Amino acid sequence: MLALGKLLELTLAGREPAEKTQLTVEGVRMRWLSEGALEVRPPEARDNGLDLLLSAGIHGNETAPIELLDRLLHDIARGDLKPRARILFLFGNPEAIRKGERFVEQDVNRLFNGRHEQSSGSEALRACELERLAASFFSLPDRQRLHYDLHTAIRGSKIEQFALYPWKEGRQHSRLELARLRAAGMEAVLLQNKPSIVFSSYTYDKLGAESFTLELGKARPFGQNAGVNVSLLETRLKQIIEGTEPEMAEQGLDGLQLFSVAREIIKHSDAFRLNLPADIENFSELDVGYVLAEDLANTRWIIEEQGARIIFPNPKVKNGLRAGILIVPTTDENLA
């Protein structure tokens, strides 16, 4: 196996490779760009025009997605997986990955779309570097652009594997991409309706990629991810990489639950209180009239929406950040 296939090993050790560029027997070029960043380029005759960005480890304790990318890289470096797409592999927050922590000082996934410019520290610099790497990768004209940012969650979920689909004014969500997600094992997709400061939103909004945050299960340490079943996703990623995806039929959305954002719960002060059990699962339903959260100046969030569910509840976020998202079921009538 080519040494550059061991990107995770290099990243965990904080080392640079002796050789920055290597070629497989079939002529696939692997090029180390910077810490946790590796570009894979197929021979020109095999290139099918897809640029695929795969990122994981934006949160350092979410190891199942990191292990998945590591397996794909090993397969490419051994010549077992023969890419027809250009691929950029990114391990998002190497420092936090080495520590086994979600982040060191700041949540990197709250520092995109200009937010890192208002901050300081190593993680703000890393968010800036990730934007630069993605922008450079997606700079070639007349190519398809696809980005999957892979995560696991800090809590359990009634729907274990789901995706978040960013939003941009004047751009419709793609039915074809949703069918692809369904084939990759996603059970639900949250169709967002406003700009965001996460990585997938940056590549969708600024770089024109079809971009998604994928949540794959519960966050666990390295080597303890047997309970996180990514087999469907892994199979689909290999097919995308090799250009062997089956045709996706119109009924490809069967069984895929669609949700839209009703409201974001923003924590304004240290007095903020979220009236939910600490172990509540993502996608838990909330009754109309329930007082979800309270803050200063008699601010209260009361459930008004039928069928409302909560995802990503986290009262420990910094003031000014999102402490949860209220979502409601939606239909596929506005898809492109």
From Swiss-Prot:
Record field: catalytic activity: N-succinyl-L-glutamate + H2O = L-glutamate + succinate
Leading EC class: hydrolase
GO molecular function, one term: hydrolase activity, acting on ester bonds
Pfam family name, one: AstE_AspA_cat
Organism domain of life: Bacteria
The protein's Enzyme Commission number: 3.5.1.96
Active-site residues, as the UniProt record annotates them: 215
InterPro entries for this protein: AspA/AstE_fam, AstE_AspA_cat, Aste_AspA_hybrid_dom, SuccinylGlu_desuccinylase
GO biological process, alphabetically ordered: arginine catabolic process to glutamate; arginine catabolic process to succinate
Binding site for Zn(2+): 59, 62, 151
UniProt keyword terms in alphabetical order: Arginine metabolism, Hydrolase, Metal-binding, Zinc
Pathway of action: Amino-acid degradation; L-arginine degradation via AST pathway; L-glutamate and succinate from L-arginine: step 5/5
NCBIfam families per record: arg_catab_astE, PRK05324.1
Family: Belongs to the AspA/AstE family. Succinylglutamate desuccinylase subfamily.
Job of this protein: Transforms N(2)-succinylglutamate into succinate and glutamate.
Protein name: Succinylglutamate desuccinylase
